[in-house]
Amino acid sequence: MRTSLLFYRTSKNANKEASVLSYELLQKAGYLFKTSKGIYSYTPLFQRVILKMTEIIREELNAIGGQEVCLPLLQPAELWEKTGRWKAFLSEKLLYVLKDRENKAMCLAPTHEEVVSEFVAQWLTGREQLPIHLYQIGTKFRDEIRPRFGLMRAKEFLMEDSYTFSDSPEQMEEQYAKLRLAYQRIFDRLNLKYVIVAADGGKIGKGKSEEFHVLCSLGEDTICVSGSYGANVEAAQAIPPSYVYDSNLLPVEEVATPNIRTIEDLEVFFNTPKHKILKTLVVKTRQKDSEKFFAICIRGDRQINLTKVASFLQVDDCELASEEEILKHLHVEKGFIGPLYCPIPCYADETTRPMTNFICANNQKDVHCKHVNWGRDIPLPAFGDFLLAEAGDLCPQNGGAPYEIFQGVEVAHIFNLGTRYTESFSVGFQDKNGDKQLCWMGTYGIGVGRTLAACIEQLADNKGLVWPLAVAPFSITILYNGGDTEGEATALQLYQSLNTEGFEPLLDDRNERLGFKLKDSDLLGIPYKLIIGKSFQSTGLLEIESRSGEKCNVSPENLLDWCSKNLPCHTRKIPPLREQN
């Protein structure tokens, strides 16, 4: 490709909304055009990157027996109602919903578990067809409340999603292991630093689940890592620091605490450390059409983990109750909620069990109690793990070694779903006794755009993008000084030679200074620059510079040999482009 024929535009300044590096550079380098908030057009440059990324995905999934399909973007509500997810997704207001001319409710696909389950249920004829692995690479939709960070959180995005159907839990685990390894190979080919962490399945499913996170400072997710074990902070099991509490139980006392609402205020008012204060939070849960409220007690120095609370209570969703809801159901203002005389069911974190003579609210405004004790002043509640893991907490999966905390961007998620969806759609087969057996299902997904954005966040430098060679739009840029007729002739000859051999060069044939072209090549993130500069006239040697700054010299006669050792060769050669008039 010649730069003069490439439809692109670079810019010195990015959109004012470009709050992250990846979004800023994709716009400045001419890869991305903002059509609307959270909706983007991919330019020819970015489409080349996308095609290479998706080709890597196809190669790895085909290698383990995956079969590519194309599932509909428009889905009927009745399929989602079979699994109970229609109302669950509607409650989050993230689903694009519409009605057809027959007034039937439809949605734009955020995922495809229901559609693929219906498909396989109709076509599966026998156990001998199992396991089945179907995958697609296509568009998904999510009506984000606050679309931001460019491709990190968009309303319309590109995903690879895989679905496996197996005849047993053991076969399901085998498929899970195959997909997990295939995903590792995909990210390894991009030379990314990433971790695989235990995760919560959320609304997709409650079975075994892991996330792939690319490590970078921007990361929206907090990752807990200890040795070879890692977990999303929402799923991480942790052993917090323990404390020794009083053995001599003191009489409970009510204390006036006018407008003392926060743990920090109580710490100062009572001159006592936070771990001796009991914090009570009210959560609202949803299970199908039912909403309930619960009180959750945790130590004052810790934060609540709503994902763990939802799992403990076995509900679909869980969130902190609003001030209005607290006032309505407990008849007390936020900041004065406690387990004493609590009118709603109350549970406590395991770390509160040894607490004695603690301070807590008693559901009266401007009043707290001190010297409160479990069993004596408050009936012993059911205890569970309700805490977010923190740096320094001990990891039970790694022999009690401490956690380190990192930020990561989730780029892939894999799940074992069991029979949750296959039961709803009767996806199964007859066993040797003639009895119907349900299939065991897995679902897996890679965010293509998120992966590329995370790649930029991790690898880019102050000069611009730094694409891995595997997905760069072009492998090498051929550069010469504008107006240098001899350099132009040499560049054209080299371009035609590399192009014919499938090395995907970009010939910068603009009438611009060499320095300008060099900066543009760095901004675009092209892995190598082939420079026909002043030294070529005296030495006859070409200069090759990598994006990382490493340099070498090569003669025109040995250029193809160098390329064959350092650049990918695409077997489908790019046909010669038309010459300019």
From Swiss-Prot:
GO terms for cellular component: cytosol. Its EC number is 6.1.1.15. The keyword ATP-binding applies. It is found in: Cytoplasm. Keywords: Aminoacyl-tRNA synthetase, ATP-binding, Cytoplasm, Ligase, Nucleotide-binding, Protein biosynthesis. GO terms for biological process: prolyl-tRNA aminoacylation. The keyword Membrane does not apply. Its main location: cytoplasm. GO terms for molecular function: aminoacyl-tRNA deacylase activity; ATP binding; proline-tRNA ligase activity. It comes from the Bacteria. It is an enzyme of class 6 (ligase). It catalyses: tRNA(Pro) + L-proline + ATP = L-prolyl-tRNA(Pro) + AMP + diphosphate. PROSITE patterns: AA_TRNA_LIGASE_II (PS50862). Consists of three domains: the N-terminal catalytic domain, the editing domain and the C-terminal anticodon-binding domain. Belongs to the class-II aminoacyl-tRNA synthetase family. ProS type 1 subfamily. PANTHER family: MITOCHONDRIAL RIBOSOME PROTEIN L39/PROLYL-TRNA LIGASE FAMILY MEMBER (PTHR42753), PROLINE--TRNA LIGASE (PTHR42753:SF2). Catalyzes the attachment of proline to tRNA(Pro) in a two-step reaction: proline is first activated by ATP to form Pro-AMP and then transferred to the acceptor end of tRNA(Pro). As ProRS can inadvertently accommodate and process non-cognate amino acids such as alanine and cysteine, to avoid such errors it has two additional distinct editing activities against alanine. One activity is designated as 'pretransfer' editing and involves the tRNA(Pro)-independent hydrolysis of activated Ala-AMP. Homodimer. This is Proline--tRNA ligase. The lineage of its organism: Bacteria, Pseudomonadati, Chlamydiota, Chlamydiia, Chlamydiales.
